[in-house]
Amino acid sequence: MAMVVSSWRDPQDDVAGGNPGGPNPAAQAARGGGGGAGEQQQAGSGAPHTPQTPGQPGAPATPGTQGDKGQGPPGSGQSQQHIECVVCGDKSSGKHYGQFTCEGCKSFFKRSVRRNLTYTCRANRNCPIDQHHRNQCQYCRLKKCLKVGMRREAVQRGRMPPTQPNPGQYALTNGDPLNGHCYLSGYISLLLRAEPYPTSRYGSQCMQPNNIMGIENICELAARLLFSAVEWARNIPFFPDLQITDQVSLLRLTWSELFVLNAAQCSMPLHVAPLLAAAGLHASPMSADRVVAFMDHIRIFQEQVEKLKALHVDSAEYSCLKAIVLFTSDACGLSDAAHIESLQEKSQCALEEYVRSQYPNQPSRFGKLLLRLPSLRTVSSSVIEQLFFVRLVGKTPIETLIRDMLLSGSSFNWPYMSIQCS
């Protein structure tokens, strides 16, 4: 799985015949046509090219080699006739889900994503994927589809235009696309596009005319925030590629922190009276000590939300913060904790580059955002359950519900979703 992370790039960085292993400036200057994973770069014999040192990677092929067979200048019609599938090397039928692939790999990827299929490799998760072996290991075939940049969200939401993030919202820099900025920008845009519905509208939709949220709306809003966290995680880069047991472990550990971040993002009203009422109506009358304890927990919750709101965190920053929280190697029983840690580092790097680009006059902003994360755990997950979810699901643990949502494939089909707060 580490191969998937180290090679992932923004789909916009790919061009016909791109090298899935990562762009090389010399190879880009030399190549004239497509090449799948593991292929040599090809160049037309006698065609003008950027001068290169003999032996330099990506140097033009000598006459008589395969490199001078049927190639034309980059971008010519002749060159495009030889575009190969970036997954298996077969003849490409066009660009599908962000990459040039054959019909077989296109159909396989579409079927795997739409049915949310989970495969198992019987070898070492590094099986060769080419025309002759592509059907032997579905796990490694899907891994390679994702490695070369095929986009899950393009399958789930139909045909999509090429990703062109709004410069004011997602773009990090307008510099050299090989310096990593395009990758970071694309990663953040995919995190944002994974949001199942606009979080920022929840609070205003549930508010009453007196600006106090009624008890009847509290559990509905809380359920939406929880469902939003799970659906978002299921659609962000890298998380769906993890083993289902790892997905469950990560969300069971971090759901309450994601809930607090979503509550802050949507400006969830946290008034003491209706929260106490929501916590007490389903149980026996609370003693004075218990009321004081609950008020303390509500105050801690309020403080965390207010501190985030005071930073005026934007949607891209919230997405990065949630990814940093989610990809934690602290979860128990992870199959590859080092891989999870590397995903957290990538999310942190994306946030750092974004903040430096968008808020150059706030040099301490990145540090302030990171410092907010450890304190999220001061909000007790059991108290969140008691305040917001017991009316909805009774004594069923949230961890059990999260597992059920992941195994069912969608929280929108989750049976509790139809329960109305009353």
From Swiss-Prot:
GO terms for biological process: cerebral cortex regionalization; forebrain development; interneuron migration; negative regulation of transcription by RNA polymerase II; neuron migration; positive regulation of miRNA transcription; regulation of gene expression. Gene3D superfamilies: Erythroid Transcription Factor GATA-1, subunit A, Retinoid X Receptor. One of its GO terms (cellular component) is nucleus. Residues 39-66 have a biased composition (Low complexity). Residues 82-157 bind DNA. CDD domains: NR_DBD_COUP_TF, NR_LBD_COUP-TF. Disulfide bonds: none annotated. One of its GO terms (molecular function) is zinc ion binding. SMART domains: HOLI (SM00430), ZnF_C4 (SM00399). Residues 1-80 are annotated as: Disordered. Keywords: Activator, DNA-binding, Metal-binding, Nucleus, Receptor, Repressor, Transcription, Transcription regulation, Zinc, Zinc-finger. Residues 343-422 are annotated as: Important for dimerization. Belongs to the nuclear hormone receptor family. NR2 subfamily. Binds DNA as dimer; homodimer and probable heterodimer with NR2F6. Interacts with GTF2B; this interaction is direct. Interacts with COPS2. This is COUP transcription factor 1. It comes from Mus musculus. The lineage of its organism: Eukaryota, Metazoa, Chordata, Craniata, Vertebrata. The gene is Nr2f1.
